[in-house]
Amino acid sequence: MGRLHCTQDPVPEAVGGDMQQLNQLSAQQFSALTEVLFHFLTEPKEVERFLAQLSEFAATNQISLGPLRSIVKSLLLVPNGALKKGLTAEQVRADFMTLGLSEEKAIYFSEKWKQNAPTLARWAVGQTLMINQLVDMEWKFGVTSGSSELEKVGSIFLQLKLVVKKGNQTENVYIELTLPQFYSFLHEMERVRTSMECFS
């Protein structure tokens, strides 16, 4: 098996067999299953609805739910890695073909990926921001009054106190910056804000 873009980890042995099972689905069945998957990828909190849709798909297409869950788990391997690494539709298609999915189905999935990319990217950014959410920020200016380096005496510095939410608790993070570092930091924050406004 060739190298994958979505992960460096070894791929579970079941994946190859699951891709062969997917290849046996008709175009209509694969399209319906892909639809269910993208509903889940764009609204990952709706787990119960996702499982209900899988059960319905299994019943409609006379497929056992156990094997179907394994197939879906293998199918999610690429999009989950692609979200973390920001892969293109072309890389998603290549990874599916490397795993053994037929070219026709890999192209279909990558086209769906391209259509849903903005929504998925927005969700991924939201998840990243929720991991370390900035709750509060305080700053103080100071002037260096004594230093072993003569040129540093009288230079202005800035102390930042960031209150970051990690899970259910908050943590204080302290940073000391020189004035040029602070302006550079401010510039980066402006760029982040502009990027975030593009997504909202």
Curated annotation (Swiss-Prot):
Scaffold protein in the commander complex that is essential for endosomal recycling of transmembrane cargos; the commander complex is composed of the CCC subcomplex and the retriever subcomplex. May modulate activity of cullin-RING E3 ubiquitin ligase (CRL) complexes. Associates with the NF-kappa-B complex and suppresses its transcriptional activity. Its main location: cytoplasm. The keyword Transcription regulation applies. Residues 133-200 form the COMM domain. This is COMM domain-containing protein 7. It comes from Bos taurus. Belongs to the COMM domain-containing protein 7 family. GO terms for biological process: tumor necrosis factor-mediated signaling pathway. InterPro entries: COMM (IPR017920), COMMD4/6/7/8 (IPR047155), COMMD7 (IPR037358). It is found in: Cytoplasmic vesicle. GO terms for cellular component: cytoplasmic vesicle. One of its GO terms (molecular function) is NF-kappaB binding. Component of the commander complex consisting of the CCC subcomplex and the retriever subcomplex. Component of the CCC (COMMD/CCDC22/CCDC93) subcomplex consisting of COMMD1, COMMD2, COMMD3, COMMD4, COMMD5, COMMD6, COMMD7, COMMD8, COMMD9, COMMD10, CCDC22 and CCDC93; within the complex forms a heterodimer with COMMD9. Interacts with RELA. Interacts with CCDC22, CCDC93, SCNN1B, CUL7. Keywords: Cytoplasmic vesicle, Transcription, Transcription regulation, Ubl conjugation pathway.
